[in-house]
């Protein structure tokens, strides 16, 4: 049934999402625990960036080349349906979905994930934070509290993502809107658990509660950006319907309308990022900006699962 198919596909995506964040956080923590040197873990970030460049860019180009090539040969030249087994390029198209949307996406977000925690640790290690008697910072297990806080936020995000996957369920005969909301429930549930864990960590460490607010701002900003992207790309909403309507007058107007829509869709994410940076800097300085990025990426495990589940379900439908 539909619920069973959703569970299988999403569970497969969750394996990839949790693996990416788990390996990333574990690598940074082990390296910093062994060497106690921010420069060493910076090298870990450089390695992740180099792999992400090739996997994301190279994989993305291959994905689109295979997709367009398969459509040109099949639908345009031969007049056969998409994903038809008579078209050999269908295999390249299915493989391309995995290369670009799973492997490439995973490498890209792996780099962003480890880069955010490395930057936060480097800020503390470089001593750019002004600490006085009213803001004492002690060590726990050999880690500075301000270094341990982002690690705990991300660790709680991994567990929250695992628990959030159990919230993703639907009923038979569900509409596309129902399926999208089932995914949102998992993401929102994971975000709520991260906030609870962050509040407990800040309270336990006896730190300023402003650190909790910057994590909250990061989470909210991430959700707004994701919702904005969905609004401009989902066929349920007006923007894509307007682009489709332009097809009545020919392909040229579709290209123009689509390009214009893509440009205007960047406005909300840009404004949200600027506002979030201003608020977090006002609350906790440079460290607050870095910690808000940690909050934004804390639920990456389940967010990445929703990205990876798409190609899995798509290829299953093609088979």
Q: Residue ranges of each PLM-predicted region?
A:
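Hydrophobic packing and interface segments
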Residues: 1-319
């Amino acid at each position: 049934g539909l619920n069973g198919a959703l569970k299988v596909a999403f569970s497969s995506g969750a394996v990839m999402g949790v693996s990416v964040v788990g390996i990333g956080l574990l690598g940074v923590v082990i390296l910093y625990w062994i060497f106690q040197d921010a420069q060493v873990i910076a090298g870990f970030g450089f390695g992740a960036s180099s792999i992400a460049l090739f996997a994301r860019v190279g994989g993305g180009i291959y994905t689109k080349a295979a997709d367009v090539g398969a459509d040109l040969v099949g639908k345009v030249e031969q007049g056969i349906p998409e994903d038809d087994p008579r078209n050999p390029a269908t295999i390249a198209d299915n493989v391309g979905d995995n290369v670009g949307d799973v492997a490439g996406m995973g490498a890209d977000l792996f780099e962003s994930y480890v880069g955010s925690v490395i930057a936060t640790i480097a800020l503390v290690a470089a001593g750019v934070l002004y600490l006085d008697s009213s803001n004492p910072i002690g060590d726990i297990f050999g880690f500075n509290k301000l270094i341990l806080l982002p690690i705990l936020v991300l660790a709680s995000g991994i567990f929250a993502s695992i628990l959030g996957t159990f919230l993703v369920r639907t009923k038979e005969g569900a509409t596309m809107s129902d399926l999208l909301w089932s995914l949102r429930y998992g993401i929102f549930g994971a975000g709520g658990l991260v906030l609870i864990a962050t509040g407990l960590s800040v309270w336990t460490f006896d730190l300023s509660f402003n650190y909790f607010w910057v994590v909250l701002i990061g989470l909210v900003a991430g959700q707004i950006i994701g919702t904005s992207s969905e609004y401009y790309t989902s066929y349920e909403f007006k923007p894509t319907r307007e682009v489709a309507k332009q097809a009545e007058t020919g392909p040229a107007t579709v290209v123009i309308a689509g390009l214009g829509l893509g440009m205007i869709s960047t406005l909300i994410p840009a404004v949200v990022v600027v506002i979030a940076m201003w608020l977090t800097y006002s609350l906790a300085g440079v460290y607050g900006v870095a910690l808000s990025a940690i909050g934004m990426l804390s639920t990456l495990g389940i967010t990445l699962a929703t990205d990876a589940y798409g190609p899995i379900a798509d290829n299953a439908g093609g088979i």
